């Protein structure tokens, strides 16, 4: 199991990303807009750099919601592969069955 501090750090990052999502999207749109003047685009770029580093969604890491494991996490379920397997075999995930052909 991952340290609780790592799990809490990821939760904090998720909150920051949600908080600054609109502002970041607006600034990125200005930077990408070719009809704006170079000065406006430059100002938007500077404002983007002023946002907190952890407000960038690329800094987020998908973690298992049970164990906090950072690797082998299925996005659809939010679980690591081993926990997904355990829960699936117990039949606790509706519609999920082991493949057989």
From Swiss-Prot:
GO BP terms: translation
Task performed by this protein: Binds 16S rRNA, required for the assembly of 30S particles and may also be responsible for determining the conformation of the 16S rRNA at the A site.
Oligomeric and partner information: Part of the 30S ribosomal subunit. Contacts proteins S3 and S10.
Highest taxon above the source species: Bacteria
NCBIfam families hit by this protein: PRK08881.1 (NF006477)
Keyword Hydrolase attributed: no
Keyword Ligase recorded: no
Gene Ontology MF terms: rRNA binding; structural constituent of ribosome
Family: Belongs to the universal ribosomal protein uS14 family.
Protein name: Small ribosomal subunit protein uS14
Pfam families, alphabetized: Ribosomal_S14 (PF00253)
Keyword set, alphabetical order: Ribonucleoprotein, Ribosomal protein, RNA-binding, rRNA-binding
HAMAP family for this protein: Ribosomal_uS14_1
Record-linked InterPro entries: Ribosomal_uS14, Ribosomal_uS14_bac/plastid
GO cellular component terms, semicolon-separated: cytoplasm; small ribosomal subunit
């Amino acid at each position: 199991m991952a340290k609780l501090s790592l799990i809490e750090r990821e939760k904090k990052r998720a909150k920051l990303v949600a908080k600054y999502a609109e502002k970041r999207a607006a600034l990125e749109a200005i930077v990408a807009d070719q009809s704006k003047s170079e000065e406006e685009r430059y100002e938007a770029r500077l404002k983007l750099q002023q946002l907190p580093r952890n407000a960038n969604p690329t800094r987020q890491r998908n973690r298992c919601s049970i164990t906090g494991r950072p690797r082998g996490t299925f996005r659809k379920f939010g679980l690591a592969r081993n926990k997904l397997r355990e829960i699936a075999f117990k039949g606790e995930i509706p519609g999920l069955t082991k493949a057989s052909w």
